[in-house]
């Protein structure tokens, strides 16, 4: 077993920089507008999906990192961009986590991808507790 380390790998640093650029160039300039509009920021989520930041593939890759650091680094950079827009981009993960934690393999395979849709047909996962 490898020794625990908080040092980021070259791949993790590349992901961090990639997301930071998206947050700086797309999220920060748009944050106030979407906050003022009080609407869901579909264009921002669509931009995230176009570059591969919003989608099941990104989440699966980030969550399968053995060091456990890729997803927290990604989330930190997204939320550096803006917390509200970050929730719009990362929010489907809550529904996906509920399904993954409690669903059968068949349910997971059917429903988790539907929490995200595709870059051309974006979907949102919703989480309800009663």
Identify the meaning behind each predicted range.
Residues 4-5, 16, 28-31, 60:
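A short, structure-level motif marking secondary-structure boundaries and short turns
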Residues 11-25:
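A non-catalytic, amphipathic alpha-helix used as a structural packing/dimerization or gating element
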Residues 22-30, 118:
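Short alpha-helical functional segments enriched in proximate histidine and acidic residues
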Residues 10-14, 51-54:
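Short low-complexity stretches enriched in small and charged residues
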Residues 1-11:
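Intrinsic disorder at enzyme termini
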Residues 32-130:
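Glycine-rich flavin
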């Amino acid at each position: 077993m490898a020794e625990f380390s908080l040092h980021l790998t070259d791949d993790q640093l590349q992901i961090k920089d990639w997301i930071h650029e998206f947050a700086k160039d797309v999220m920060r300039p748009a944050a106030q507008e979407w906050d003022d509009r009080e609407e869901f920021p579909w264009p921002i989520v669509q931009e995230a999906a176009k570059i591969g930041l919003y989608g099941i593939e990104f989440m699966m890759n980030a969550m399968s990192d053995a060091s456990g650091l890729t997803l927290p680094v990604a989330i930190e950079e997204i939320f550096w961009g803006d917390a509200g827009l970050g929730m719009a981009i990362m929010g489907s993960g809550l529904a996906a986590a509920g399904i993954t934690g409690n669903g059968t393999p068949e349910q997971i395979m059917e429903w988790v991808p539907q929490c995200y849709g595709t870059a051309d047909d974006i979907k949102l996962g919703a989480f309800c507790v009663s």
